């Protein structure tokens, strides 16, 4: 028996090579390994670093239900070799495991990042044998023993935070105990193995339509936590189950049971799993998200947009609602320029005379809406010092688009010999080079003919499990399309490095870091009620970096000045998506918009380097008070919202400022009209807002 111990960036990992070469992952934590923490140490098939399932091979050991544990040949993979080196990010470790029966090998990678308590995990499966193998599951991250530290049973000490995500109610974290999922601990300690399983999955092309591809596990006894994100723009899966007296966490991309995915590996073929990043903390959720935020900045495509954080005006939300005309655009352009916007995006509808939902795909201007052409509008936008943009939806084609009747079926997702469609649209298949060429031609034409520098790339359907045309399985077709789309997107950015493309999917239904490592900006929601939007805004930096999180601000025609302030504060610590009928606001309210944008331009240099904090916790949609902080080395920007309720006073604690000299100011609005005070003794900021539905932006300077 041999041990491999890795200590890197405050992380402790312990692997074991048994005498029969079985490879075990015994420890992953913020503290050194304690052998006594393992209950069922003698179990021969436990603590596997990789779970892999090939069709046609038996599992000799007990498991219950649909757990991806005791997989075959995962249970008898043998250690072969290890490589340990460094690259530009930090240390990188690779283990080679082999199944002697099938001659399938797995290369398991761990990428460390200097100074960060986080690891990116992925696996490459290679068939080095002589027979075709059917791969239907490969873990990206697999760790048994997530409950082993601390003396209390798991159901008394573990809490799971799950980020629910849905249309108009994105980034909605909820906290659960194991008992909430029927996972009470009632079996003998060494034999805990039930059929209960906590699973969070996505099946389809909307990667975040029900949940974000993330999770957080907290051990409340040891005050440690684990935050993970699965980096795939389609189907993914994570599960927590019990086996061998311990709980395990397994995270992966698509699989056969939940995603209709399997892949035939012919001799010599390889398959690379989706990456999973895991951050460990002994300082709480905020610290784990801060680490993840820094990691997300590292893996993201270098781009000017995330350095400049320019302000976008978009004519859709609580404004033109997808029915633009030249006559309506001109006053909006004037008002947006006067307020200080830097991009102006013409949203949906510019390409159709009337109803357009089921006819999209040609992407040519409507002469009825724009008699002198869209170029007249984009030229006017540029004359006002702004960069023009337009809305597109390039992964779909309406069933009544003339092109859809002219191109062959292999342009689209197919199942059972029929085209796949949803909501009167067909799903385009980016594996097809003709589809990619068509998409390129649209991008090229809009840039050359209209001079656009910004594209809002929307996506409003869910094609389900995938396509079985030219694929081993529907899920295989789906994953191959998604990876082809990412490669196409990378090629677009290579051709047009200054082009900004916004990731939108009915709002935030594809918030994942396969997409967001390419896209510089993300639409977070279609939420059209600013009073609810503050919850999405406050929580959004848990899902993506603040400088990628586009938040709508849409002052209403009939509102008052506090309504404007609330709207603006929603967006001021993130990316501003300005909208609303600015030209029709009173001068006082227009001035408040301009004041907010002017202030934003002075603080955005700090936003791109800050990490988020939630001094009173993550927000929920019916909380009376909500706040979000962005912390840098010497200051904290703090957005505070009061909704309805009978509590005009909130005390906001800042334990991290203990024994530090600070000064507090209200940045926005300039008229303030709220009371606030700082207690040096208790490190608490007390804020009083006498009216309901008020918001303010503060700055806490650390001296």
Report each predicted region and the residues it spans:
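Polysaccharide-binding surfaces and accessory modules of carbohydrate-active proteins
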Residues: 2-240, 259, 665-675
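Active-site-proximal substrate-binding groove within the catalytic cores of carbohydrate-active enzymes
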Residues: 9-13, 28, 485-675, 686-699
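Conserved, mostly hydrophobic/aromatic
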Residues: 10, 123, 268, 381, ...
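Solvent-exposed beta-strand/loop surfaces of large extracellular or lumenal domains
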Residues: 240-254, 665-688
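Aromatic- and glycine-enriched glycan-recognition loops and surfaces
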Residues: 257, 315, 319-406, 437-441, ...
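Short Pro-Gly-centered flexible turn/kink motifs
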Residues: 263-282, 693-701
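Active-site-adjacent "subsite" loops/lids of carbohydrate-active enzymes
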Residues: 308-310, 321-323, 367, 394-445, ...
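Active-site groove signature of glycoside hydrolases
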Residues: 340-350, 438-471
């Amino acid at each position: 028996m041999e041990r491999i111990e890795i200590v890197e960036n405050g992380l402790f990992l312990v692997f074991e090579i048994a005498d029969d070469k079985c490879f075990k992952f015994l420890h992953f934590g913020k503290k050194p390994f304690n052998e006594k923490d393992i209950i069922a140490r003698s179990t021969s098939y436990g603590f596997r670093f990789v779970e892999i399932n090939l069709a046609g091979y038996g599992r000799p050991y007990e498991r219950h239900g649909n757990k991806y544990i005791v997989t075959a040949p995962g249970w008898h993979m043998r250690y072969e070799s290890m490589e340990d080196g460094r690259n530009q990010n930090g240390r990188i470790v690779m283990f080679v495991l082999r199944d002697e029966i099938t001659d399938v090998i797995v290369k398991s990678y761990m990428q460390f990042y200097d100074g960060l308590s986080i690891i990116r995990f992925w696996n490459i499966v290679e068939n080095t044998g002589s027979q075709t193998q059917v791969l239907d599951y490969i873990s990206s991250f697999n760790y048994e023993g997530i409950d082993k530290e601390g003396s209390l049973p798991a159901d008394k000490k573990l809490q799971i935070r799950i980020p629910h995500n849905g249309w108009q109610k994105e980034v909605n974290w909820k906290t659960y105990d194991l008992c909430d999922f029927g996972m009470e601990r009632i079996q003998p300690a060494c034999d805990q193995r039930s059929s209960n399983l906590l699973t969070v999955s996505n099946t389809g092309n909307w990667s975040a339509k029900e949940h974000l591809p993330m999770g957080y596990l907290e051990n409340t006894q040891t005050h440690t936590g684990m935050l993970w994100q699965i980096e795939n723009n389609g189907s993914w899966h994570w599960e927590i189950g019990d086996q061998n007296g311990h709980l395990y966490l397994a995270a992966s991309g698509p699989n056969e049971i939940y995603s209709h995915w399997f892949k035939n590996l012919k001799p010599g073929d390889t398959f690379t799993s989706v990456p999973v990043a895991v951050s460990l903390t002994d300082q709480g959720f905020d610290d784990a998200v801060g680490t993840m935020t820094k990691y997300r900045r590292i893996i993201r495509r270098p781009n000017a947009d995330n350095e400049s954080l320019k302000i976008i005006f978009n004519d859709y939300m609580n404004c033109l609602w997808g029915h633009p005309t030249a006559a309506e655009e001109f006053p909006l352009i004037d008002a947006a320029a006067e307020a200080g916007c830097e991009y102006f995006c013409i949203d949906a509808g510019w390409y159709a005379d009337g109803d357009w939902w089921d006819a999209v795909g040609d992407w040519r201007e409507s002469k009825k809406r724009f008699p002198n052409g869209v170029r007249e509008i984009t030229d006017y936008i540029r004359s006002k010092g702004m960069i023009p943009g337009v809305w597109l939806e390039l992964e779909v084609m309406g069933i009544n688009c003339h092109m859809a009747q002219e191109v062959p079926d292999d342009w689209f997702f197919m199942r059972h010999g029929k085209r796949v469609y949803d909501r009167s649209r067909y799903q385009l298949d980016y594996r097809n080079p003709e589809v990619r060429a068509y998409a390129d031609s649209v991008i090229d034409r809009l840039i050359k003919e209209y001079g656009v520098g910004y594209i809002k790339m929307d996506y409003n359907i869910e094609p389900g499990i995938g396509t079985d045309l030219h694929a081993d399985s529907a899920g295989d077709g789906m994953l191959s399309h998604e990876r082809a789309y990412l490669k196409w997107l990378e090629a677009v950015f290579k051709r047009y490095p200054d082009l900004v493309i916004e990731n939108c999917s009915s709002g935030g239904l594809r918030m994942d870091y396969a997409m967001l490592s390419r896209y510089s900006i993300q639409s977070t929601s279609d939420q059209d009620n600013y009073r609810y939007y503050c919850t999405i805004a406050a929580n959004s930096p848990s899902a993506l970096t603040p400088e990628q999180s586009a938040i709508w601000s849409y002052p209403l025609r009939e509102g008052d000045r506090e309504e404007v302030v609330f709207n603006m504060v929603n967006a001021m610590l993130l990316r501003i998506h300005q909208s609303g009928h600015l030209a029709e606001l009173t001068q006082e309210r227009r001035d408040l918009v301009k004041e907010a944008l002017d202030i934003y331009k002075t603080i955005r240099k700090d936003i791109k380097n800050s990490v988020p904090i939630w001094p009173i916790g993550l927000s929920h949609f019916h909380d009376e008070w909500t706040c979000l902080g962005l912390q840098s080395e010497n200051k904290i920007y703090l957005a505070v919202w009061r909704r309805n309720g009978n509590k005009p006073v909130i005390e906001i604690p800042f334990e991290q400022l203990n024994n530090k000299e600070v000064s507090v100011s209200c940045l926005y609005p300039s008229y303030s009209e709220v009371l606030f005070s700082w207690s040096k003794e208790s490190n608490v900021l007390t804020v009083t807002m006498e009216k309901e539905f008020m918001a303010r932006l503060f700055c806490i300077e650390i001296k």
